[in-house]
Amino acid sequence: MTNHWNDYQHSDVFMNIGGNTAENHPISMKWIEKAREKKGAKLIAVDPRISRTAAVADVYVQIRPGTNIAYLGGLINYILENERYHEEYVENYTNATYLVNEDYDFNETDGLFSGAYDDPVRNATSYDTESWMYQRDEEDNVLKDPTMEDPNCVMQLLKNHYSQYTIENISEITGADPEALQESYELFSSTGEAGKAGNILYAMGITQFTHGAQNVRAVAMVQLLLGNMGIAGGGVNAQRGQSNVQGSTDMAMLYHIIPGYLPPPNQNSTPTLEDYIEKETPPAGWWVHRPKYMVSLLKAFYGDNANGANEFGYQWLPKLDGLDHSHIAQYKDMSEGIVEGMICWADNPAVSGPSAGAMREYQN
């Protein structure tokens, strides 16, 4: 969540997708209504169901369940096709000008990107992402095209990828009325103008999918294109409350992070602290500080026993075994006898978790 709830009063347009703000997050709705009353803000509701939020929305787009990513892809295409993006923001504060390796490719026939291969360990398609990397000069600086006209720059690759997301195609996929799509796209993309602020609100209706991460990334891409990040009334705002998602991540209760949002060590790929730092430290961006965070964490855990001579106690830190221990995978392991017991505390996974039918089947 990038903005706080009372900041909503500064928004010009709200998009509520994958959530029911009026019913499930009434305090946030208070600030939405304040913006509507004081500055004439508009509310778009995207939902398969006519919820209480949809009932009071200025524009309601009824889509089929599970087609959020198509709807958002259509919005991205509309922004790009009609040049509604905030050009100054996109050029200076996103990677749109960056040049990608020339051998990057996307196959429209099978929907796979370059580098795809069958991973026998995961029994699924994985990617060698080398072709996705940026072009760099001799000093390892990313090559850029400020005009964003080079066919290998991120902006042109984005345009090409989303060019098939026409209103006609999106209407066919989502079942939404083309006029409602057009109206919602036009209204929300208007926030790409200087001095305007668009706010996207979402909840579990966006995240609880096998492609939930892609849904949220699509939301983020919309806001970056429109320059709606880092401003009052803008942002990508998850409506928290269910299952305390924020707390579970901030407190590192999930298997894919340790405190400080650090990737967990892996006994196969990062058996030593040197391996971890080399693998998990990017060449640029805020996470170049990751080695400092890891050492600070080890010192906090092990105190004076952690020092440079013993890798600051890195070998004492539990490590992943390379297998999938994510939420769904754990329950699948129950059905295969790998997990033989479970203590369920203050949770009802048969109801509140994703793929509830599969949850109940796996537990049996």
Say what each PLM segment does.
Residues 73-78, 218-225:
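Short, hydrophobic/amphipathic alpha-helical patches that form generic packing surfaces
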Residues 84-89, 180-181, 197-200, 229-238:
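Acidic/polar loop patches that form or flank catalytic/metal-binding clefts of enzymes
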Residues 26-29, 54-58, 72-74, 100-105, ...:
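Short acidic, glycine/serine/threonine-rich loops at helix termini
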Residues 1-32, 41-44, 70, 154-157, ...:
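Extended redox/cofactor-interaction regions of prokaryotic respiratory oxidoreductases
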Residues 49, 67, 162, 189-198, ...:
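Secondary-structure capping and boundary motifs in well-ordered enzyme cores
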Residues 51-191, 282:
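Long, well-ordered, tryptophan-enriched scaffold segments
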Residues 92-97, 187-188, 203-205, 235-246:
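A glycine-rich phosphate-binding loop feature that marks nucleotide/adenosyl-phosphate handling sites
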